[in-house]
Amino acid sequence: MNKRTTYCGLVTEEFLNEKVTLKGWVHNRRDLGGLIFVDLRDREGIVQIVFNPDFSEEALQVAETVRSEYVVEVEGVVTKRDAETINPKIKTGQVEVQVSNIEIINKSETPPFSINEENVNVDENIRLKYRYLDLRRQELAQTFKMRHQTTRSIRQYLDNNGFFDIETPVLTKSTPEGARDYLVPSRVHEGEFYALPQSPQLFKQLLMISGFDKYYQIVKCFRDEDLRADRQPEFTQVDIEMSFVDQEDIIAMGEDMLRKVVKDVKGIDVSGPFPRMTYAEAMDRFGSDKPDTRFGMELINVSQLGKEMNFKVFKDTVDNNGEIKAIVAKDAANKYTRKDMDALTEFVNIYGAKGLAWVKVVDDGLSGPIARFFEDVNVETLKQLTEAKPGDLVMFVADKPNVVAQSLGALRIKLAKELGLIDESKLNFLWVTDWPLLEYDEDAKRYVAAHHPFTSPKREDIEKLDTEPENVQANAYDIVLNGYELGGGSIRIHDGELQQKMFEVLGFTNEQAQEQFGFLLDAFKYGAPPHGGIALGLDRLVMLLTNRTNLRDTIAFPKTASATCLLTDAPGEVSDKQLQELSLRIRH
């Protein structure tokens, strides 16, 4: 075998008249009777190679036996394509390789699905079972090239700005951080378990106490939680922590890094500073703590109608301290039938809304199921509040504020997709700040941390921890991109007494706090610097930069929605001997 001189996808006009050695997979083969054309593929792309008896009769005979996905090595000379055969769709489309020698390195059975088609209409489970074949597709090859470019850009930025890449343990202690832990039984310590880290949160804080000042890690994290399209049980996080900083320092660093990544990976200049919005404003205007700002259709408070109208649903809602909000779908009145509106009503029911009221704005007023409840003065109020015009569709939810936000926020996204309102070329970054420190868990009847127990409250709110914990704001911030939470961070608690107080508010006894977090509380006794950080979801960032809609497309060997690996059949049963060594017994 000869040494490869270049990749297939890099053979351009600069190689004209040069002899090259290429290695790759047969992407496509066309026998034109006397001439055989093969598209040869590798990770960089495709180049057309030609088998011509005038060039090599022996090579032509071998080419007659090759089939799709055979692995071959070819030698030949790069020539200019005839004008009528130039392919402007690919980088190598101006040239072809006249083959003088071919060697079949390995044969292939017929794949279970086509690899040489751009849009593979095949069940995802089949693709995941044969993931090594799926990854040969150019679409996915490009995705993972961009993933590499993304991580390279991140490392370059952090290295150039004085950060140390430090690894933290994978086998650690189970602590209550939100989701369920993946547990690993210890053979040496019978009946005891390690946990796989949900994040390196505590270790990166300990590194700040150790004096390392600037830390980063591109790290695997594990969470045993219910899955959806943008979640995986194991995922990659860009984890960053800094000492002697405030929120502004971390936001500035995060923006600089993300602008560099977008420039390096997509060649796009993103202007800064990124817009900011408080948590309260995001929920009020968009019904979401991760608003997609690529389009309008904001939530509008129309609770005034509940006071003016003789419509029992609206009136009762306002009388019971609820609220009424509306969204306006411009020029959509004729695009949704009553049956469509029934389907939208069922959609908001998922989010706890009892119903979806709606009217269509027409030239002489309103039409629709609740139009009869609107008197002329109410119509004018509605138009003033919503700026609705004839042809618009106005939808209302009247309920508790959190139900209104969740249901209309989700409906807003659904309608925008259906109506084609989203400019997919945009990258809209947004910081969401001033989060509540705590949330009240109705089931547990206690407060839980909105982010995690180590987030510091705003200094001016510390005294409220005892009297009105629901009104304490956190030194926390999320970075949002196109309606997805890209990452989040906070300034951490660095005072042992305040951390102990936080545990008390969360319902921990002193003994429980010491048992679970004693090592952190002890570390605070030895001079902890002020510190804070941020963690970005790498898989999600790549998904958004590559315009994918499924997180699994950005992970080489992902799990399914039920947390299984169809390629390896993990998780799987283990032998009785292995269970005995771990002092475990399975109960069915």
From Swiss-Prot:
InterPro entries: Aa-tRNA-synt_II (IPR004364), aa-tRNA-synth_II (IPR006195), aa-tRNA-synth_II/BPL/LPL (IPR045864), Asp-tRNA-ligase_1 (IPR004524), Asp-tRNA-ligase_1_N (IPR047089), Asp/Asn-tRNA-synth_IIb (IPR002312), AspRS_core (IPR047090), GAD-like_sf (IPR004115). L-aspartate binds at E177, R223, H451, R492. Its EC number is 6.1.1.12. One of its GO terms (cellular component) is cytoplasm. NCBIfam families: aspS_bact, PRK00476.1. Homodimer. The lineage of its organism: Bacteria, Bacillati, Bacillota, Bacilli, Bacillales. Residues 201-204 are annotated as: Aspartate. Its main location: cytoplasm. ATP binds at R223, D224, E225, Q232, E485, G537, L538, D539, R540. The keyword ATP-binding applies. Catalyzes the attachment of L-aspartate to tRNA(Asp) in a two-step reaction: L-aspartate is first activated by ATP to form Asp-AMP and then transferred to the acceptor end of tRNA(Asp). Belongs to the class-II aminoacyl-tRNA synthetase family. Type 1 subfamily. Keywords: Aminoacyl-tRNA synthetase, ATP-binding, Cytoplasm, Ligase, Nucleotide-binding, Protein biosynthesis. CDD domains: AspRS_core, EcAspRS_like_N. This is Aspartate--tRNA ligase. Signal peptide: none annotated. HAMAP family: Asp_tRNA_synth_type1 (MF_00044). It catalyses: tRNA(Asp) + L-aspartate + ATP = L-aspartyl-tRNA(Asp) + AMP + diphosphate. The keyword Plastid does not apply. GO terms for biological process: aspartyl-tRNA aminoacylation.
